Amino acid sequence: MQGSVTEFLKPRLVDIEQISSTHAKVILEPLERGFGHTLGNALRRILLSSMPGYAVTEVEIDGVLHEYSSKEGVQEDIIEVLLNLKGLAVKVQNKDNVFLTLSKSGIGPVVAADITHDGDVEIVNPDHVICHLTDENASINMRIRVQRGRGYVPASSRVHSLDEERPIGRLLVDACYSPVDRIAYNVQAARVEQRTDLDKLVIELETNGTIEPEEAIRRAATILAEQLDAFVDLRDVRQPEVKEEKPEFDPILLRPVDDLELTVRSANCLKAETIHYIGDLVQRTEVELLKTPNLGKKSLTEIKDVLVSRGLSLGMRLENWPPASIAED
């Protein structure tokens, strides 16, 4: 194996051991040391908590008002019936919400195969027992709601999201949407040529039958990759502050000296010196103005007082004066 010591080994799928239709082992190697646990733990958490699936969320049973009751002719109490309904493994095509019905009478077990549904729904475990009827005259009728979701959502967390006037007899069920029943991984030693410090990741996975183990791992890896995409293209996404453009010069500096309302004598003296704008005037010093013909100390005092009243003074320095708008004039 040639290459730079800084290059990471890229793992490959070595084997998929199909133990049953719902149980498989997936083996990947070689992994850099430590990456077996890094990837194995991340995939395990996603497979257990973040895989989408379908679960029973509500049930209505004829003659039953609440879950802490029993039904005549049914061996199990209602809480046990609800627990059994949680074990239904359902596949639904192109729908997020479906209703199923179950009607059964006579002695014997009531199983998932007794549920009536349309062509978009498949009961993966038809032999799953829901309850037992103990009398020839006994019967049970129920309406089952199945919804798509992710992870585990207890019934208590959905109470406030439902209509305030929830009909009496509508029983809420803790929803376990994840199609993964069990996931475990272990990291073994691997070797590539002279390197013996590598990892081999073995993932053992069992599902409820609504998804194949290999497909479950593929989806989990896709979820992980999508979450990491943001780090691949990491950059400052904060919007730059929009700063208000301040004018280069105080607007008063761009006004003509006539706006100062000086005496005619003072105004004429300034015009004779080609001082047309207040910005031109404030850059002159007292000494420079006193050299202006016919402009004496009285006129100078008048000019200084007018400028002070406007927050200005003589001898100011203005960078980049005159502005383009004045220079063009």
Curated annotation (Swiss-Prot):
InterPro entries: DNA-dir_RNA_pol_insert, DNA-dir_RNA_pol_RpoA/D/Rpb3, DNA-dir_RpoA, RBP11-like, RNAP_asu_C, RNApol_insert_sf. Its EC number is 2.7.7.6. It catalyses: RNA(n) + a ribonucleoside 5'-triphosphate = RNA(n+1) + diphosphate. It comes from the Bacteria. It is an enzyme of class 2 (transferase). CDD domains: RNAP_alpha_NTD (cd06928). SMART domains: RPOLD. Residues 249-329 are annotated as: Alpha C-terminal domain (alpha-CTD). Residues 1-235 are annotated as: Alpha N-terminal domain (alpha-NTD). Belongs to the RNA polymerase alpha chain family. NCBIfam families: PRK05182.1-2 (NF003513), PRK05182.2-5 (NF003519), rpoA (TIGR02027). This is DNA-directed RNA polymerase subunit alpha. It comes from Histophilus somni (strain 129Pt). The lineage of its organism: Bacteria, Pseudomonadati, Pseudomonadota, Gammaproteobacteria, Pasteurellales. The gene is rpoA.
